[in-house]
Amino acid sequence: MARMRQPRFKTCRRLGINVCGHPKAMKRADNGQVRDKRKLSSYGIQLLEKQRLRAYYEVMEKQFKIYVKAAIKDSETTGNSLIKKLECRLDNLVYRTGFGSSIRQARQMVVHGHILVNGKKVDRPSFAVSVGDDISLREKSRKNKIFIDNFLRNVDFSYPYIAKNEAGFSGQLIRMPERHEAPIEVNDHLVVEFYSKTI
């Protein structure tokens, strides 16, 4: 499985925003470690926004283009459609629900068979979760203290498109997410513009 291997904190500082959600990710940014502030060209700005969006979901370029192409074909705004498709990836929803402390950990949980969708094991991080699908922790995996602690200590859970069931160690996608509900700082219009001449 192809994956992004760059150090998370270094990536955050290079992109100028905290894409991994860790409170210490931008700690050294004030010491000149953050990306160069020089003026970017229009292309450079579009490229930066694309890199930021990819980094939030840790999706490789080849697969990211597939999402963009699919979003372009949708009837709704391309940017909105793209974000929805990325938000509904299984690894992302495992992370949002609180099973993993990061999207990388959530992805590993999926790959190693710890996650069930509607009671069946799914080991593909890119699996597209549909409205009404239940995401749960495999019975055997509920003995893992790390997974349990992650799930129960996520007190700041605030995703209105996900219903979290702490007693059942599960979550359900109850509706499609709205663009403004995705906790990301990206200008998706610029991302679409970046690909408009090549796709």
From Swiss-Prot:
One of its GO terms (biological process) is ribosomal small subunit biogenesis. InterPro entries: Ribosomal_uS4, Ribosomal_uS4_bac-type, Ribosomal_uS4_CS, Ribosomal_uS4_N, S4_RNA-bd, S4_RNA-bd_sf. Residues 88-151 form the S4 RNA-binding domain. One of its GO terms (molecular function) is rRNA binding. It holds the Pfam family Ribosomal_S4. The keyword Isomerase does not apply. PROSITE patterns: RIBOSOMAL_S4 (PS00632), S4 (PS50889). It comes from the Bacteria. The keyword Translocase does not apply. Gene3D superfamilies: Ribosomal Protein S4 Delta 41, Chain A, domain 1, RNA-binding S4 domain. One of its GO terms (cellular component) is small ribosomal subunit. Keywords: Ribonucleoprotein, Ribosomal protein, RNA-binding, rRNA-binding. SUPFAM superfamilies: Alpha-L RNA-binding motif. Part of the 30S ribosomal subunit. Contacts protein S5. The interaction surface between S4 and S5 is involved in control of translational fidelity. Belongs to the universal ribosomal protein uS4 family. One of the primary rRNA binding proteins, it binds directly to 16S rRNA where it nucleates assembly of the body of the 30S subunit. This is Small ribosomal subunit protein uS4B. It comes from Alkaliphilus metalliredigens (strain QYMF). The gene is rpsD2.
